[in-house]
Structure formats: C-alpha cells, structure tokens
Amino acid sequence: QISSRYNDVYEVENLPDTDYGEITAFIEQNNIAIKDDLTFSEYLPQKSDFHQRVKYDFPPLAIALKDYNAVRKMLGYEPITLQTDEFATHWHRAAEDKDIENYIAKHTLLETDAGTLKLSENAVFQEPVGESIYNLYTDVVYIIPDEIAQVLLPVQSNRFVMTQYPL
C-alpha cells in the first residue's frame, strides 16, 4: 500500500497528483508478477475541511463505494451495498466497540458538498484493510456512493498492489 497525503499541503492547487508511474516502472523492471493492482482517490466530504489542521481533529476521509468494494474484493471480502443517499463507515481494527458506538450515535448524518447522506442500516465495517486509507489521527473512513464522490475534493491518492508471490 502506498498513499499520498494532503496533510502537509496548504493550498488545494498544490495537492499531489501522481499516477505512481515510478512504482509501475519498478514492478516492470523487476518482473514482479501482480495478482491485483488498484489506484483510487479519497475525498474530503466538505472542501471547507481542507484547512482543518488541528492534531487529533483531522476530518475523516471518504472513499467511493466502487473503490471500497474493489479493496474488499482484493482482500477476499464480500462487497457491500449502499443506497444513493446513504453512507457507511470502515473502522481501524484498534478502534474500541464503545468508541465506534458513541461515534455512530452522534454521526447519523454526513454533510457533504454534494448533499446530506444518512447512515446506512448496515453501517459499520472493521475488516483489516491496511493503514493507508485513514486520515492522520483518525480511525474511520466514510464509504459513500460513487455519484457523491465525483463531486468532492480528492485529497489523497492510494495504490494497493498485491503480488502473485511473496517478495
């Protein structure tokens, strides 16, 4: 897993824009057999949160449903579904059940630049997916409909590569 971070970028126009070409070149030069390869973006639900830089108060990021399901498939998990006006959450494995319950109770709606989403009935996922999908100092990522993601500000790029054989 490789990801860019927006946290040290202070202007939207300076956000990293990478296609991870150097990774592709390394894979090709070393004849590494690839089983799965996925590049995707994560978004701020509200662009106004871009300048929120208080340690331990960074906003959670959002991932488009199609990308989240592609990650799940890559890792052998079943896909999830959402209605067009719903969101779900994916939690870091270290997050405590009590903390998740408290957060969910206070966050039944998600305000985005594309409108308000309501919490899905099946809203909490916690399978291991790696560290790079979470924003700094957060244990949760929002899963949102693809149509909503298309309207939001992409701030982080991720590339997940699974090799055919252990390196």
Describe each region flagged by the PLM.
Residues 2-167:
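Basic-flanked hydrophobic alpha-helices used for secretion and membrane insertion
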